[in-house]
Design a protein with these regions (language model features):
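Beta-rich interaction/scaffold domains
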Residues: 21-152
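Positively charged n-region of N-terminal signal peptides that target proteins for export
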Residues: 1-7, 23
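C-terminal motif of bacterial Sec signal peptides marking the signal peptidase cleavage site
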Residues: 16-20
């Protein structure tokens, strides 16, 4: 009798342990938590002033990689800024930048001429000659935070 009871107990334990896998929990809760977690610049056009071999002043443009330039993200004040100004001759009107958000939130940028928002695309150049406002929305679409970005 003991020999028949052990396989029966193993089968019952197997059925009970596999029964917990039958629940199909398809409800997914999106997070309301949102923040900008990273901000980096790309290549910027910079004008360099130099003298030619004849002693005449001349200028030339060069695309310089500023991805290593440090930016601070103040989560309390919702501000993003660089502690050191960009070098002389950098054109801040056409800047490529990359923005990372918490929980893959949606990042939008406010228009300079109206109150409309558009989806931020890191392949489009952005005018940072004036402070810009970025909005990051949570995955649930309920919560958002507004950040002011200053590039000096």
């Amino acid at each position: 009798m003991k020999i028949k009871l052990i396989p029966l107990m193993v089968v019952v334990c197997g059925i009970l342990s596999l029964a917990s896998c039958l629940n199909d929990d398809s409800d997914f809760v999106y997070s309301d938590d949102t923040a900008i977690t990273s901000f980096t610049l790309g290549k910027l056009n910079q004008v360099f002033h130099t003298k030619s071999s004849q002693g005449k002043d001349s200028t030339y443009r060069k695309s310089v990689d500023y991805s290593g330039h440090k930016f601070y993200i103040d989560q309390v004040k919702c501000e993003i800024y660089n502690p050191d100004s960009l070098p002389l001759g950098v054109n801040a009107k056409k800047v490529l930048c990359s923005i990372g958000s918490k929980n893959a939130g949606y990042v939008g940028i406010k228009s300079m001429t109206s109150d409309s928002l558009k989806y931020f695309n890191s392949t489009d150049s952005t005018d940072f000659s004036v402070p810009r406002e970025f909005y990051v929305y949570s995955n649930s679409g309920v919560a958002y935070r507004k950040y002011t970005v200053r590039v000096n």
